[in-house]
Amino acid sequence: DLRTVATDLRNRLREEEAVIVLGAQDKGKFPFIVAATDKAVERGVKSGDVVKQFGQYVDGRGGGKPDMAQGSGSSAAGAERGFAAVEDMLESL
């Protein structure tokens, strides 16, 4: 599942300043997850804020903790634009 993959990637990248954003179409829905390493959180990344930003593009919502948050949307159509918006958001930190 997405949480397992995100956790595994975060653990592999734990020495880096990294943010993982994953999503997948599943039975007409679009679940997504954000995981941030400790260094990214120290820099000011809040996974819940990233989920909110991404959620706007997939008609979704969600929340969580600074290091991991998840949500679900109803449309994958805007996912590509959502990933681009998240990238812009993170570059501005």
Over which residues does each language-model region extend?
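Glycine-rich, acidic loop segments that terminate in or are immediately followed by a histidine
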Residues: 1-93
